[in-house]
Amino acid sequence: MAITYQTEGIKMPDIKKRETTEWIKAVAATYEKRIGEIAYIFCSDEKILEVNRQYLQHDYYTDIITFDYCEGNRLSGDLFISLETVKTNSEQFNTPYEEELHRTIIHGILHLCGINDKGPGEREIMEAAENKALAMRKQ
């Protein structure tokens, strides 16, 4: 089982793949989950808009789209991340780009672990889970 990192039409972000993979596995383990096949696809705003329209019938830009292929406690999915939106968000929230990128990377994993962020009170739960995961990365 593996975590892969790919790009579509853009330069690969400067992330430490081995460390990031180990961090993702550690976060998943806190939810009693194992990694199956996870593919991160880093892309542009235009690509994520295309994916959003084609597969979700949403006509807007977003930072991440997670396609869930999980089976039991094994996490599998395709996670599209717009690096342009991540950069915009880091500026808007006045956070370092690297931190915002890792927040987005783990956000998709947390969705695969069953954490939602659309209903009442769910955004706060997701944000707390993201902060806990980011703290694990810094240790």
Swiss-Prot record:
Question: What is an example of a Pfam family matching this protein?
Answer: YbeY
First-listed, main subcellular location of the protein, grouped into a coarse class: cytoplasm
GO MF assignments:
metalloendopeptidase activity; RNA endonuclease activity; zinc ion binding
Report the co-factor binding details.
Binds 1 zinc ion.
SUPFAM superfamilies from the UniProt entry: Metalloproteases ('zincins'), catalytic domain
Give the GO biological process terms: rRNA processing
The EC class name is hydrolase
Q: Which domain of life is it from?
A: Bacteria
Cytoplasm as UniProt keyword: yes
Q: Does the keyword Translocase apply?
A: no
For this protein, the record's InterPro entries field holds: MetalPrtase_cat_dom_sf_prd, YbeY
> Which amino acid positions bind Zn(2+), per UniProt?
H107, H111, D117
Q: Show which residues constitute the signal peptide.
A: none
List cellular component terms (GO). cytoplasm
Instruction: Name the Enzyme Commission number(s) assigned to this protein.
Output: 3.1.-.-
Q: List required co-factors.
A: Zn(2+)
Tell me where it resides.
Cytoplasm
Going by the UniProt record, its keywords in alphabetical order are:
Cytoplasm, Endonuclease, Hydrolase, Metal-binding, Nuclease, Ribosome biogenesis, rRNA processing, Zinc
Family (UniProt):
Belongs to the endoribonuclease YbeY family.
Q: Which HAMAP family match?
A: Endoribonucl_YbeY
Q: What does this protein do?
A: Single strand-specific metallo-endoribonuclease involved in late-stage 70S ribosome quality control and in maturation of the 3' terminus of the 16S rRNA.
Protein's name in the database? Endoribonuclease YbeY
Name the source organism.
Answer: Bacteroides fragilis (strain ATCC 25285 / DSM 2151 / CCUG 4856 / JCM 11019 / LMG 10263 / NCTC 9343 / Onslow / VPI 2553 / EN-2)
Question: Upper lineage ranks?
Answer: Bacteria, Pseudomonadati, Bacteroidota, Bacteroidia, Bacteroidales
